[in-house]
């Protein structure tokens, strides 16, 4: 049985997708009004809706390729080794299809939750906090990164970090929860090792808050 998604986790995902829209606009984050935030949230919801169709189309194409490999293993394979290789490729493609479909099954619930007042309220609060406190948040992140530059990170990684700091400093979310949720967002939207980097940066931020000790230069743990 599929686990039910948490409303706040959906709100975080919507917030991240909303912030990604800002990079495509000339509007400065700190000048956004409530109507602008609502429009960003609507665009994020539509992005999720389009993702369902894209996932299903990709899964369908991969399933067709898997079927083709199975046929080739029976008809064209010249020996046992080549047949085995084709079967393994077909199995890998099928596994990928199953994983994609599992994600597609979750998305309708995400879209349903996105329309709930509780989810929208927290998402708007998150987006608004990041926009209003952008300078303070970025300064804190840059200090924790030391000889790394926040501006050189992928935009999606910057926004994941900003959301986490907004939760930690301004919304009263416990450290462990804020960091874990940021890591989960990174696993889905960041690069291959993005979640480890983000975890390291946020750990440094919280350690610095706790003991006030200077941060040692180098890559975040």
Curated annotation (Swiss-Prot):
Gene3D superfamilies cross-referenced by the UniProt entry: NusB-like
SUPFAM superfamilies: NusB-like (SSF48013)
A Gene Ontology term for the protein's cellular component: cytosol
Alphabetized GO MF terms: RNA binding
Gene Ontology BP terms: DNA-templated transcription termination; transcription antitermination
Cysteine pairs bridged by disulfides in the record: none
Keywords noted in UniProt: RNA-binding, Transcription, Transcription antitermination, Transcription regulation
Keyword RNA-binding listed: yes
Pfam families: NusB
InterPro entries: NusB-like_sf, NusB_fam, NusB_RsmB_TIM44
Role: Involved in transcription antitermination. Required for transcription of ribosomal RNA (rRNA) genes. Binds specifically to the boxA antiterminator sequence of the ribosomal RNA (rrn) operons.
PANTHER family assigned: ANTITERMINATION NUSB DOMAIN-CONTAINING PROTEIN, N UTILIZATION SUBSTANCE PROTEIN B-RELATED
Family as reported in the entry's similarity comment: Belongs to the NusB family.
Full protein name: Transcription antitermination protein NusB
Organism: Synechocystis sp. (strain ATCC 27184 / PCC 6803 / Kazusa)
High-level lineage: Bacteria, Bacillati, Cyanobacteriota, Cyanophyceae, Synechococcales
């Amino acid at each position: 049985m599929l686990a039910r998604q948490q409303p706040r986790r959906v709100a975080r995902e919507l917030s991240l997708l909303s912030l990604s829209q800002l990079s495509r606009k000339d509007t400065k984050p700190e000048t956004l009004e409530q109507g602008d935030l609502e429009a960003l949230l609507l665009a994020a919801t539509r992005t999720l809706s389009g993702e369902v169709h894209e996932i299903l189309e990709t899964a369908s194409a991969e399933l067709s390729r898997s079927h083709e490999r199975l046929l080739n293993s029976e008809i064209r394979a010249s020996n046992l080794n080549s047949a085995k290789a084709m079967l393994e490729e077909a199995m890998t493609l099928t596994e990928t299809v199953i994983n994609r479909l599992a994600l597609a099954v979750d998305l309708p619930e995400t879209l349903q939750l996105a329309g709930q007042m509780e989810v929208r309220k927290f998402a708007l609060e998150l987006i608004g906090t990041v926009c209003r406190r952008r300078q303070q948040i970025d300064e804190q992140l840059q200090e924790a990164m030391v000889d790394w530059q926040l501006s050189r990170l992928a935009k999606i990684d910057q926004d994941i970090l900003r959301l986490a700091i907004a939760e930690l400093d301004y919304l009263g979310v416990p450290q462990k929860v804020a960091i874990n949720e940021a890591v989960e967002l990174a696993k889905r939207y960041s690069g291959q090792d993005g979640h480890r980097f983000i975890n390291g940066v946020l750990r440094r931020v919280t350690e610095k808050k706790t003991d006030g000790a200077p941060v040692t230069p180098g890559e975040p743990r």
